[in-house]
A protein has these predicted regions:
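Compact nucleic-acid interaction/catalytic patches
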Residues: 85
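Unchanged
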Residues: 88-164
C-alpha cells in the first residue's frame, strides 16, 4: 500500500484460499454506491439505506490492519481461510477499544496503536434463521510486539502469522 497517499479504502477480494487486501480510490467506491454486480453487470439493489437495513439484525464489529516494525501485516487462519483479525463489539464498548481488544484476543499481540481510521465494510449472512447485517469498522494499527503469536483456538483460529 506504499505510494498510495490519500487512499483510505480497502477492498477485500476473497477466493477459496485467502482474502487479499487491495487499495482502491474513494471515487471508485462512491460511483458504485448501493450497487451489486450480478453476472458482471451492475444492479442497483437499494436506493434507501435505512429501508435496506430494516430487513436485518444489525451487528457492529471492529478489526485491524496491523503492521509490525518490518511492515508485515498480521493475518489469522480461521475456517480454512486467511483473514484479518476482527470481532463483535460488546455493549457500551467504544469501537476503537473493540478493534484493539479483538486483535489482542485473536492473535495474542499487545502494544497496539491505532494510527488511522479506515472504511467500514458490510457483511450479510444468516444466523439461526435470521438475516444479519454486520458492519465492521476497520483501523490501521501498528505494534512493536515481538513475542509469540497465539491463535484464539476457541474462536476457530488455528494460525496467526505476519505476512509481507
Amino acid at each position: 500500500m506504499k505510494g498510495l497517499s490519500g487512499c483510505k479504502i480497502i477492498a477485500f477480494i476473497c477466493s477459496k484460499d485467502l482474502a487479499t487486501c487491495l487499495p482502491i480510490s474513494i471515487s471508485e467506491i462512491m460511483t458504485q454506491k448501493y450497487k451489486v454486480f450480478i453476472n458482471n453487470k451492475p444492479k442497483i439493489i437499494v436506493t434507501d439505506w435505512k429501508k435496506f437495513c430494516a430487513h436485518y439484525i444489525l451487528i457492529e464489529a471492529a478489526g485491524g490492519l496491523v503492521y509490525n516494525r518490518e511492515d508485515e501485516l498480521l493475518m489469522i487462519f480461521r475456517n480454512g481461510k486467511w483473514d484479518l483479525p476482527k470481532g463483535k463489539k460488546e455493549e457500551a464498548e467504544e469501537i476503537e477499544s473493540c478493534a484493539k481488544r479483538e486483535v489482542e484476543e485473536e492473535c495474542g499481540v499487545s502494544g497496539l496503536e491505532i494510527t488511522e481510521k479506515l472504511i467500514d465494510t458490510y457483511h450479510i449472512y444468516t444466523h439461526k434463521g435470521k438475516k444479519v447485517l454486520k458492519r465492521t469498522y476497520w483501523f490501521k494499527m501498528t505494534t512493536n510486539f515481538e513475542g509469540v503469536l497465539i491463535p484464539q483456538t476457541k474462536e476457530g483460529i488455528t494460525k496467526v502469522a505476519w505476512v509481507k
